[in-house]
């Protein structure tokens, strides 16, 4: 019952912070950035997929992608998402704040569970749990709601490691027996939490393993003999591997997506490994210790491109780092001190910080929630010890730092060369109005901090000596003030997030995305076709239910990355093409372009030159609709081909010619060219000047369309097409190449050929034939077998008497 009460307190506190903004928007939570164009569309698309039974492949996710691979980072492993599937799809956008509140309630419970093992009192653990669950990190990442699964369950993973250490270290004690149930439970808990955390979010799991490794070495290994430590590490590794094996059925679906993601190729190198490239970054890190956090993507003071999307915040409501400063002064030797200082060094050394993000060159502070839990602990420890002197010193340091940051906002700046006038003030900040909110909310907390560290009650009387001996400064007043500051932290960030968006933006988002669907004249006449909405309507197609070529999602199929990388534009977090890429649009079966006329009033389709071959065919839901008159249905053949190397040379010389060549030539690697080159009438090795003309391009589009499949249908397992060919040829399909695909022609197994760098083709004989593509995540069967084997081993260990697995005697 205690944890149930805590859970509902956390839920209600977050809902109290977000409710005014829901009411302001007319009953729905509208925020900014990725929340509007990723979190909500992703939930709706995934919810629809689950309800319709599409668990493996989704044709509405970019050019098509694996659900388990592409959404594993966002929601596929989230228990909160699967809970949302119990509700009707129409409810999902309105229930998003409720689902978020469940994560806050969970974080409050799990952090309390770990902190209770470290504090003297339950009240102290509760105060620390509020600091963690409602920290600045939590607030600034409301825009990234999939981060909160990791923060919600991390304290349990830390608790599981503590219990596993205790179990292993006492496994050989005679007083504990050879293999007591408590020892087994300790190991079992760590195995299960390792499995769960790897499924919940594999990206955060990597950072958690690193942090737990540092935590173990500092807290436990430093106090043990080397031989004992090595034995424990080996057993923990075995338990961890067993946990990963238990989740193999899930993780195998991620491997292909990870292996082809171009973002993994960007590593820190050279001086960037030891010093941040932008001088404002260390100052921004310092600011994150003391003040309400910046919005992700909208910095105020010390902002830069490097930290813009970093999720940078180490802020504890009310206390900031005053408790940590006090603890460092009071305790010269403790594992908490060593771990705090280690985290501080890691934060300011780029290569160490990057280790938590797979050494990516982009700056991320997305591991800061883990030291925040430690900051919460040491703050509570100081309060329980009633260390007024050191706490007051810490409070003064926080106040001094906040004053200095405020003064930095007034630093003089020299205007740009184009601007007139001399030195100006208050111009150093990119978003000064956001800094005002940060400063005001932080300033409101400072006197409350002084009230707590001075042990003042609301009545003006100090606690009794008995209460002070029991709880120190963790009084009811202190707890109430901390809860108030937790509310202010979330509300302050939410206020800033609502400040940067126009009032009409929420209404347009609600009307155009959720309540209506553009009716496209002629859509559905083709068996399969894609549309493309402009940049103001990112990912709207997911909600509307139209296949698209425009998608903002970081972890799509590796074939999509390879395709965009090969043809020129490249891809990082989204798939998008300039208006000049008409050839790429054609082979992707893009049929319609939608321009949001309600938003793009000045910078519109016509003024940007438009798309050659497109014409306006109607208006709907605030969109101008343009149809591609030279649309090529999916599944078609080519007469000519070009090798990847030749295309790369052409791309370097003339990007326009290279783009239009995509409609004339199928691009093959050397191996495929050698095997299937004889099927084509010719191979192009240089630019054909004719392909640069519009007439020639349109002619090639008509040729490709004339060879398109006569029928095409998608299913839960893939797609089926019928094609009539006048000769044996490769039939090209604009879906990403993945190892999980298998193809059959008239029921006979056929080889899938990688074409156009990352898409697919299959060899079909002359005549009319049925082509079937079936998708099953590569390695899924093997992953299931590994998971079942791990489950058997785990059950055997837990149920059978005296198993060998994990016994310390085995390692003697």
Residue positions per predicted region:
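Extracytoplasmic/lumenal acceptor-recognition loop(s) of multi-pass membrane glycoenzymes
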Residues: 70, 194, 482-508, 519-590, ...
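Active-site-proximal, structured, solvent-exposed surfaces of multi-pass membrane proteins
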Residues: 673-812
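Membrane-embedded helix bundles of polyisoprenyl
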Residues: 10-14, 100, 105-117, 123-168, ...
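Membrane-interface helix-loop-helix junctions at transmembrane boundaries of multi-pass membrane enzymes
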Residues: 224-234, 323-347
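Active-site lumenal/periplasmic loops and adjacent helix-entry segments of GT-C-fold
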Residues: 20-118, 123-155, 172, 196, ...
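Contiguous transmembrane helix-bundle modules in multi-pass membrane proteins
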Residues: 204, 335-513, 766-812
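Membrane-interface micro-motifs in multi-pass membrane enzymes
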Residues: 69-74, 93-104, 131-158, 165, ...
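Periplasmic/ER-lumenal interhelical loops and adjacent helix-loop junctions
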Residues: 37-46, 65, 72, 79, ...
């Amino acid at each position: 019952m205690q944890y149930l009460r805590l859970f509902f307190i956390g839920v209600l506190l977050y809902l109290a912070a977000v409710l005014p903004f829901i009411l302001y928007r007319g009953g729905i939570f509208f925020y900014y950035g990725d929340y509007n164009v990723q979190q909500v569309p992703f939930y709706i698309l995934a919810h629809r997929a689950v309800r319709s039974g599409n668990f493996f492949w989704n044709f509405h996710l970019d050019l098509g992608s694996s659900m388990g691979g592409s959404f594993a980072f966002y929601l596929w492993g989230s228990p909160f998402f699967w809970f949302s599937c119990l509700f009707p799809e129409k409810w999902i956008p309105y229930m998003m704040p409720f689902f978020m509140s469940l994560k806050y309630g969970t974080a409050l419970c799990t952090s309390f569970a770990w902190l209770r093992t470290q504090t003297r009192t339950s009240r102290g653990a509760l105060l620390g749990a509020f600091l963690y669950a409602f920290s600045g990190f939590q607030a600034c990442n409301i825009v990234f709601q999939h981060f909160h699964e990791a923060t919600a369950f991390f304290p349990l993973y830390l608790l599981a490691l503590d219990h596993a250490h205790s179990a292993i270290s006492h496994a050989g004690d005679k007083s504990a027996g050879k293999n007591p149930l408590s020892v087994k439970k300790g190991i079992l808990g760590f195995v299960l939490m390792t499995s769960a955390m790897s499924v919940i979010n594999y990206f955060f799991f990597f950072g958690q393993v690193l942090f737990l490794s540092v935590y173990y070495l500092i807290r436990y290994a430093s106090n043990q003999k080397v031989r004992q430590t090595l034995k424990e590490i080996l057993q923990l590794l075995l338990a961890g591997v067993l946990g990963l094996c238990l989740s193999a059925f899930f993780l195998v679906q991620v491997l292909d997506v990870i292996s082809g993601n171009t973002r993994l190729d960007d590593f820190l190198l050279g001086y960037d490994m030891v010093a941040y490239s932008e001088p404002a970054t260390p100052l921004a890190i310092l600011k994150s210790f003391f003040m309400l956090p910046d919005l992700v993507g909208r910095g105020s003071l010390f902002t830069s491109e490097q930290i813009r999307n970093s999720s940078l915040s180490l802020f504890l409501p009310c206390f900031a780092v005053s408790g940590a400063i006090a603890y460092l002064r009071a305790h010269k030797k403790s594992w908490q001190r060593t771990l705090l200082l280690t985290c501080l060094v890691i934060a300011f050394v780029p290569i160490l910080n990057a280790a938590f993000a797979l050494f990516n060159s982009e700056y991320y502070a997305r591991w800061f929630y883990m030291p925040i839990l430690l900051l919460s602990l040491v703050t509570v420890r100081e309060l329980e010890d009633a260390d007024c002197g050191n706490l007051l010193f810490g409070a003064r340091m926080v106040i001094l730092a906040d004053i200095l940051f405020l003064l930095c906002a007034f630093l003089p700046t020299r205007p740009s060369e184009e601007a007139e006038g001399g030195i100006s003030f208050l111009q150093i900040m990119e978003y000064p109005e956001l800094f005002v909110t940060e400063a005001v909310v932080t300033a409101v907390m400072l006197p409350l901090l002084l009230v707590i560290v001075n042990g003042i009650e609301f009545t003006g009387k100090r606690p009794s000596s008995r209460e002070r001996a029991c709880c120190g400064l963790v009084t009811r007043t202190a707890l109430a003030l901390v809860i108030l500051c937790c509310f202010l932290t979330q509300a302050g960030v939410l206020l800033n997030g609502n400040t940067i968006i126009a009032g009409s933006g929420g209404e347009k988002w609600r009307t155009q995305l959720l309540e209506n669907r553009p009716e496209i004249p002629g859509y559905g006449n083709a068996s399969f076709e894609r549309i493309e909405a402009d940049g103001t309507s990112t990912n709207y197609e997911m909600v509307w239910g139209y296949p698209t070529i425009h998608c903002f999602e970081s972890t799509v199929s590796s074939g999509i990355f390879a395709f965009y990388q090969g043809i020129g534009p490249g891809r990082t977090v989204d798939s998008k093409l300039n208006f000049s890429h008409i050839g790429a649009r054609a082979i992707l079966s893009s049929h319609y372009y939608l321009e949001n006329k309600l938003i793009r009033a000045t910078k519109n389709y016509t003024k940007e030159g438009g798309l050659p071959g497109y014409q306006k065919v109607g208006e709907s839901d605030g969109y101008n609709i343009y149809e591609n008159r030279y649309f090529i249905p999916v599944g078609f053949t080519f007469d000519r081909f070009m090798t990847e190397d030749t295309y790369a040379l052409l791309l370097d010389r003339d990007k326009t010619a290279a783009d239009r060549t995509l409609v004339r030539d199928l691009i093959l690697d050397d191996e495929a060219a050698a095997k299937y080159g004889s099927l084509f009438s010719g191979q192009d090795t240089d630019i054909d000047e004719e392909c640069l003309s519009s007439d020639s391009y349109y002619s090639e589009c008509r040729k490709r369309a004339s060879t398109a499949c006569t029928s095409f249908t998608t299913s839960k397992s893939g797609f089926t097409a019928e094609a009539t060919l006048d000769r044996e040829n490769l039939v090209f399909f604009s879906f990403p190449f993945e190892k999980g695909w298998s193809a059959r022609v008239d029921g006979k197994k056929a080889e899938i050929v990688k074409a156009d760098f990352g898409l697919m083709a299959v060899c079909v004989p002359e005549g009319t034939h049925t082509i079937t593509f079936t998708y099953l995540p590569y390695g899924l069967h093997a992953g299931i077998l590994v998971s079942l084997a791990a489950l058997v081993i785990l059950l055997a260990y837990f149920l059978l008497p005296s198993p060998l697995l994990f016994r310390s005697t085995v390692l003697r």
